[in-house]
Amino acid sequence: MVLFRGLKPAFKKVNKIKTKLDLHSVRTADDLLNTKDNLKFVKAVKLLIKPSTRFNRFYLSTIRKFAEFVQNITENQCGFFSQEIGFLERGLERSSRTLALCLKYFFPEEVNFANISSKDALWIYATFTAALFLDIGKIAVKYSITLFHKK
């Protein structure tokens, strides 16, 4: 079994704050994406991206790799409306909304992205990945994650 630990923010190490050891198993992309909210966001993306071969080849593979990278790490939000939400759910929500906005404002006569040119499809994919990966640097900056085998 492969585990990862160190989901406490890195500043706790610097300030020598004692925290309990927290171990989490590394999960597969299918396992991570198989939640009600995540399935809803993936379905929203799939409905917009046509043909389905384009979705399966580009979008789904990117979503799966993103899910395996961020796992179930939570993103802490500070402020008046503070909440704890996972990087995966936040990225999927942001990217699905971005695709819907692109369709509405750049292609108002279209129902989905089936009839757009290859050049436009590339721009839409770039916009999708930018929205999905927006906060991915926070994982490297805020967290210290160690991967090890339990034996």
Q: Where are the model-predicted features located?
A:
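N-terminal low-structure segments adjacent to metalloprotease catalytic domains
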Residues: M1-L21
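Acidic/His-rich, divalent-metal-binding segments that scaffold phosphate/diphosphate chemistry
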Residues: K18-K151
